[in-house]
């Protein structure tokens, strides 16, 4: 046991070496204090050294003792005088020393790696609550009626889109140019009818689905209106060309025959039909006597057939 002098002016060298040994021992124990047993033994040792340091009046020894105590306390889990653990809940890098025997609050720098947060503090979610939104705008439960923004204005949504069911009365409805012109025409027509005191004709809805299916099958014109089937058939028949007439076989029979006007190129120009009552015997003699009406490739006694 070495003898210590109580003089305030000077301290022997063994005292300084003892202080250095305390620093080294405290650092080693603080670095290895990962279990509860090491922590308890370290705190008991520091309490004993704290009581021994109170007997000395030197300010240098008190400052070194306070620094060593604060350094060890920063490395180990701090406990107060009543045995309750003190949990550090902030990560600012500084902490107060509640066990300073002198009474002065010494603040020591604490690294973030040595601070252990409790389970409640460590279980905080890293992301906040996701606010529901659609195309960058808040949903209707979070946005008021006066702050509802329409995506059609910014060009985020195409021109034609289904209208929502819960539309406020004061909110505008966006339509394309064609629909807008139709709305204006209907408004003008209604205004004229109201000025003339005429009743506006209300369209009746379909009473059955079969009527709707029949309307879908009907022929429509260019404007989308229904066309009359009889007029449609007459127009088709009037537009049919004459060369679409089905071909007939021309027979040299006493009952009927067809008179043909053949052009110089051999193309049929017109067709005329006559009955046997209107034909005299001179026509038969004309066909038999005139050789220019005979075909060179066929004999005169064979029947001539022409296909249109």
Curated annotation (Swiss-Prot):
Transmembrane segments: none annotated. Keywords: Activator, DNA-binding, Nucleus, Transcription, Transcription regulation. One of its GO terms (molecular function) is DNA binding. Expressed in flowers and siliques. Residues 53-76 are annotated as: Disordered. One of its GO terms (cellular component) is CCAAT-binding factor complex. One of its GO terms (biological process) is embryo development ending in seed dormancy. It is found in: Nucleus. Residues 204-229 bind DNA. A motif (Subunit association domain (SAD)) lies at residues 174-197. Heterotrimeric transcription factor composed of three components, NF-YA, NF-YB and NF-YC. NF-YB and NF-YC must interact and dimerize for NF-YA association and DNA binding. Belongs to the NFYA/HAP2 subunit family. Stimulates the transcription of various genes by recognizing and binding to a CCAAT motif in promoters. PANTHER family: TRANSCRIPTION FACTOR NF-Y ALPHA-RELATED (PTHR12632). This is Nuclear transcription factor Y subunit A-6. It comes from Arabidopsis thaliana (Mouse-ear cress). The lineage of its organism: Eukaryota, Viridiplantae, Streptophyta, Embryophyta, Tracheophyta.
